[in-house]
């Protein structure tokens, strides 16, 4: 086995170890965990709503880039052998009639309420944070050991069937002289949101106060830095709320599903 293969096997082992700790009850944001491995957002819906969401994602690929779709009733994915989507995420959200009913570290009981749940794994921008760091671009929420800040915007997504809502974005402060580089690096990963959707001027997105994110934690913006916004996989949760979806299970923002797929797989 050469050095590349050893590094790849080590990264996969780290991903599997992380999923095991979450299955055993550890609750922590996943930014910076298992560097080099693809992370994913989750939304699981009864089969009756699955086509609506599939169409919603197809019409809004920047915010909802699908990496995998499970068979109805199956809590497994080919992106992580031996995993269980009901237990291997640190924190889940259970939604009822468009409202957040509870957050749990194990979704097995809620999942069992419907025998035809269809799970969608959606690309996450955590995936390209390792390449940003390797280029010497600081990722502030990793430095600070907190969750990434996420914001609802005034940008409407294209509706599909019974689903509608606005785009959610994540924000990372980037030095002004490195914004173009950060955009180019992330742009090489279109399956995990790709390049930013907006740079600077948060008010144009309807964001009035960066210190009060709708999801996640606020981070500092230093002199000479610019807030840079990427489409975010929490967008489906905004659609669940806006559309009054009767039942859904999602990851909690910032608490992702870590796959066995290297981030280089989605590099173009």
Curated annotation (Swiss-Prot):
It comes from the Bacteria. GO terms for molecular function: lyase activity. SUPFAM superfamilies: PSTPO5379-like (SSF160920). Gene3D superfamilies: PSTPO5379-like, PSTPO5379-like domain. Keywords: Lyase. Its EC number is 4.2.1.-. Disulfide bonds: none annotated. Belongs to the D-glutamate cyclase family. This is Putative hydro-lyase PSPTO_5379.
